[in-house]
């Protein structure tokens, strides 16, 4: 059976650079060629972030490549895109990012019932020693798994 929410595009650096505190699902306002390009995995969330402007959420810095079969009415690659969310959730996000050290970052773009959704997160930036500790922990876990596997044979 196919996964309901398989990610079309994911921000793989997010979990390395940030500590994820809470995630939300949002809709996104897109043009037709943008949707087709995202379905072809033609988008990146590398330098993207979410900003609250006039009590609305905006995805800034998301690069969606031109649709290769598009015509002269193709979309602009690096435009700001509006995110759709309930007002109480927007207020919660706005309050969280006003707190020192917290940010709103996009984690993934995925399909849900034929519509493209954005998974965003309230996150706290990691310091370099936190990143090193995470890498060491992951390395230790991997070595333990390999040792257990060797013991079984």
UniProtKB/Swiss-Prot annotation:
A Gene Ontology molecular function term for this protein is: RNA binding
- Subcellular localization(s) per the UniProt record: Cytoplasm
Bias-annotated ranges (Basic and acidic residues): 133-143
Q: Look up the record and report any one GO term of the cellular component aspect.
A: cytosol
Instruction: Read off the HAMAP family from this record.
Output: SmpB (MF_00023)
PANTHER family given for it? Answer: SSRA-BINDING PROTEIN, TMRNA-BINDING COMPONENT OF TRANS-TRANSLATION TAGGING COMPLEX
**What family, per the record?**
Belongs to the SmpB family.
The protein, known as: SsrA-binding protein
Q: Which gene encodes it?
A: smpB
